[in-house]
UniProtKB/Swiss-Prot annotation:
One of its GO terms (cellular component) is EKC/KEOPS complex. Belongs to the GON7 family. Its main location: nucleus. It comes from Schizosaccharomyces pombe (strain 972 / ATCC 24843). This is EKC/KEOPS complex subunit gon7. The keyword Transmembrane does not apply. It comes from the Eukaryota. Component of the EKC/KEOPS complex that is required for the formation of a threonylcarbamoyl group on adenosine at position 37 (t(6)A37) in tRNAs that read codons beginning with adenine. The complex is probably involved in the transfer of the threonylcarbamoyl moiety of threonylcarbamoyl-AMP (TC-AMP) to the N6 group of A37. Gon7 likely plays a supporting role to the catalytic subunit pgp2 in the complex. The EKC/KEOPS complex also promotes both telomere uncapping and telomere elongation. The complex is required for efficient recruitment of transcriptional coactivators. Keywords: Activator, Chromosome, Nucleus, Telomere, Transcription, Transcription regulation, tRNA processing. It is found in: Nucleus; Chromosome, Telomere. Component of the EKC/KEOPS complex composed of at least SPAP27G11.07c/BUD32, cgi121, gon7, pgp2 and SPAC4H3.13/PCC1; the whole complex dimerizes. GO terms for biological process: tRNA threonylcarbamoyladenosine modification.
Length: 73
């Protein structure tokens, strides 16, 4: 039987995926610890992604964004 797994990837930093696994056949106490730990780790990953996004936005200039061109029908 497979483990319960969650993978979370940051769009701005795909080199550091986050993976959390819980073995099948766990005790109820382990489930609570698992979800508390999972929540903390996902929050940490979201914070990391937000920091990466902020850095990316600060370094991008007007010339880095392609110009919008009208669609001609």
């Amino acid at each position: 039987m497979n483990n319960l797994e969650l993978t979370y990837k940051c769009e701005t930093d795909t080199t550091r995926p986050f993976l959390k696994s819980l073995p099948v056949g766990f005790e109820p106490v382990e489930v609570d610890d698992y979800y508390i730990s999972l929540k903390e780790q996902v929050r940490a990953m979201q914070d990391h992604c937000n920091e990466e996004f902020t850095k990316k936005m600060q370094t991008e200039g007007k010339n880095d964004v392609p110009e919008e061109k009208p669609i001609i029908l």
